[in-house]
Amino acid sequence: MFIGFDYGTANCSVAVMRDGKPHLLKMENDSTLLPSMLCAPTREAVSEWLYRHHDVPADDDETQALLRRAIRYNREEDIDVTAKSVQFGLSSLAQYIDDPEEVWFVKSPKSFLGASGLKPQQVALFEDLVCAMMLHIRQQAQAQLPEAITQAVIGRPINFQGLGGDEANTQAQGILERAAKRAGFRDVVFQYEPVAAGLDYEATLQEEKRVLVVDIGGGTTDCSLLLMGPQWRSRLDREASLLGHSGCRIGGNDLDIALAFKNLMPLLGMGGETEKGIALPILPWWNAVAINDVPAQSDFYSSANGRLLNDLVRDAREPEKVALLQKVWRQRLSYRLVRSAEECKIALSSVAETRASLPFISNELATLISQRGLESALSQPLTRILEQVQLALDNAQEKPDVIYLTGGSARSPLIKKALAEQLPGIPIAGGDDFGSVTAGLARWAEVVFR
């Protein structure tokens, strides 16, 4: 049996075809979405959990070496890896919030797959993280289906990483493919996420149109200009319908990070001075919220940075504020900070102003954020998104008849307004912002596996 599988940066979902239409399966708490989050007692617990409780093979030298190190470490630290040691989605978030110092938590592992400079052991670790999530998702889907799931079309962005090009894309897709096969999928095919989203929209068209698909996901923005219509449906070879592509590693997570940095970090002393009037360095505050940047997070949570924060508290004109950043370092609160910014971003799609409260840092710590403040904070990532739109159009040398806007950030009035200003007079259509890619992947699975 085949599925469409959106292994997303923000959320994961799965769809099957029923009576000619995509049907999304339940993933968690009666929702079709599973937030892309995972937690365990230690990162080493994930590798042992796969082997001990799910008989997932360690296929090559690096994964075997990782498994041996993991088992040895867990034994030395007296960590008993049980079947419930690894949690996913909102369940993992709840565990992390309950005890951030004792829980190893990762959000959006897909964000890291195309990173340059990854060592073989890091690639092996990310493969295990992805495999664990895919295994869990496959089990959730399998419980709702009568036949064994053996085939999947998995979505992928145009570019996994802003830098690195083909090498980064090859690395990231390789991790996804190996992880999927270890998780039990016999046949794996990849499809570009904006193309998949467009396929779902195409099912509604009665005539051929040039459709600009703008897919703003959690970790990437992908744009494709496509010829779509009844005559293209069910064609296995659609090369002639793909007029132009572009993609970059800017997505909803980057919007959340930018909002946290601009509006929340000043509460924690960013922009302050020493007693001598010297500006405090900005980098520790940026690294604290850059949750999709492995080197930045490693640097922030290093012991060297802990010593730097001690020095900053000692020298700052407002040491009580910098001490709050020190608490983020000590209790590993980066994800909670960015999550608070995300909640404000969502609220500002329907209200003019919202209150950001950070009681997990300090009871009275709060600030008001307006839509104008949001627009100012997001100006740089929004500019990058619009650059990708223009790049796809330049690549195609054609103008769209319609814009199909999708992805988790598609609901933002700021993005719709910016697109309307960039391409005046062109209608903007939308669908299921969180499910269109998955639905399109299921449609493509029916074409390639039928």
From Swiss-Prot:
Species of origin: Escherichia coli (strain K12)
Gene3D superfamilies recorded: 3.30.420.40, Actin, Chain A, domain 4
Record-linked Pfam families: HSP70 (PF00012)
Gene Ontology CC terms, in alphabetical order: cytosol
GO molecular function, one term: ATP hydrolysis activity
Gene: yegD
BP terms from Gene Ontology: chaperone cofactor-dependent protein refolding; protein refolding
Entry annotated with the keyword Membrane: no
Family: Belongs to the heat shock protein 70 family.
InterPro entries: ATPase_NBD, Heat_shock_70_CS, Hsp_70_fam, YegD-like
Protein name: Uncharacterized chaperone protein YegD
Alphabetized UniProt keyword annotations: ATP-binding, Chaperone, Nucleotide-binding
Organism domain of life: Bacteria
